[in-house]
């Protein structure tokens, strides 16, 4: 049985691309037709590409690897966080801080600081400090949690990135390429598919479309992890 059906893709509006004037000619092979000034994505190709990405994700998880979900645009934030958590993976859904991968040493120091603040809160340090200082520390903690909360358990480089909208997440993709980390991404008709290792042609602007594809990728990870457990 297919991991995703044409019916599911249609219902979620995955086939709706961008206006024809905002397109990248390199996406031509994934476009089925044009309707009312909007490109319609060929869902038969999307099904094949989802299956390909599913297999990659599943294999990484079976090998005990990790995947970083990246989606900072409003339509992606919730799905990226939920599906990463559901599959026990990491996520960035607020803002990609330059160097999150290429300068991971520095990011790790910020994560250590976040852990330190969490410990201070847990062990009662906050209760004995002056109120003004606690307010300042809490503010620092909240800020770190907001931007780094989804990767605070990530101890080393991920084995792949799952990205929603490569145009929006260009810096993340550049960093992944620099480090030789493969990128799996939902690619809309206005994006450049050459920047992505595993293209999933689809609507990256509709919450339901993003949720459907992100949850399918999370399912792949969960299935892959079960493979690890059964082999163990």
UniProtKB/Swiss-Prot annotation:
The keyword DNA repair does not apply. One of its GO terms (biological process) is translation. Keywords: Ribonucleoprotein, Ribosomal protein. One of its GO terms (cellular component) is cytosolic small ribosomal subunit. The keyword Ribonucleoprotein applies. GO terms for molecular function: structural constituent of ribosome. Belongs to the universal ribosomal protein uS2 family. This is Small ribosomal subunit protein uS2. The lineage of its organism: Bacteria, Bacillati, Bacillota, Clostridia, Peptostreptococcales. The gene is rpsB.
